């Protein structure tokens, strides 16, 4: 029954394009299920929807139009990804992946009292493992399709440019 409901919800999302506020609300609801510090992740939830200014390296950006969502990513100021989807869950998942990793990394920087400018996290396998574990723990807390996609590595396919 749960599979039918989530399948039906996914089909409904394909027919109805969710707007920025609804996407942000769903992302926030997912993040509240985790143990991640809200004061760190909260400023990053709306960032993917900004339309001007400085675009962070390799971070997700989203434009919404009547045909769906445009997934955008910049590297060194150059747009490297411009891809369409009609699936709101892909947008939510993509933003969750970025926000969860970023929040975990910033939290680790605070724990080790580094600023990532003059001081950096030690290049230590145990630090890397703590980050991986915390990201996995966050997706486990969220569960469902987003946890499945995380373990399948769906972010890589989302960030692969569409064939022309």
Language model segments and positions:
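Conserved aromatic
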Residues: 17, 82-85
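Generic alpha-helical propensity signal that fires on short helical segments
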Residues: 80, 87-89, 109, 113
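Charged/polar, solvent-exposed surface patches and flexible loops
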Residues: 25, 29-33, 93-97, 137
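N-terminal "first-domain core" detector
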Residues: 1-61
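Ampiphathic alpha-helical segments that act as solvent-exposed interaction surfaces
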Residues: 85-104
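Intrinsically disordered, low-complexity, charge-dense segments enriched in Lys/Arg
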Residues: 2-21, 104-164
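A generic structural signal for ordered alpha-helices
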Residues: 5-9, 40, 62, 69-73, ...
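Short aromatic-glycine-(Arg/Gly/Cys) micro-motifs in beta-strand/loop hairpins
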Residues: 51-79
């Amino acid at each position: 029954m749960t599979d039918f409901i989530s399948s039906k919800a996914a089909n409904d999302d394909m027919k109805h394009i969710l707007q920025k506020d609804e996407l942000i609300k769903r992302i926030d609801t997912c993040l509240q299920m985790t143990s991640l510090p809200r004061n760190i992740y909260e400023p990053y939830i709306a960032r993917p929807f900004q339309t001007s200014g400085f675009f962070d390296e390799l971070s997700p950006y989203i434009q919404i139009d009547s045909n769906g969502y445009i997934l955008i990513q910049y590297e060194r100021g150059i747009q490297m990804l411009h891809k369409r989807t009609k699936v709101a869950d892909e947008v939510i998942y993509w933003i969750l992946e970025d926000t969860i990793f970023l929040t975990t990394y910033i939290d680790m920087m605070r724990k080790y009292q580094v600023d990532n400018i003059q001081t950096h996290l030690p290049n230590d396998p145990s630090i890397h493992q703590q980050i991986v574990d915390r990201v996995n723990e966050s997706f486990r807390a969220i569960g469902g399709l987003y946890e499945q996609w995380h373990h399948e590595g769906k972010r890589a396919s989302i960030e692969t440019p569409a064939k022309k």
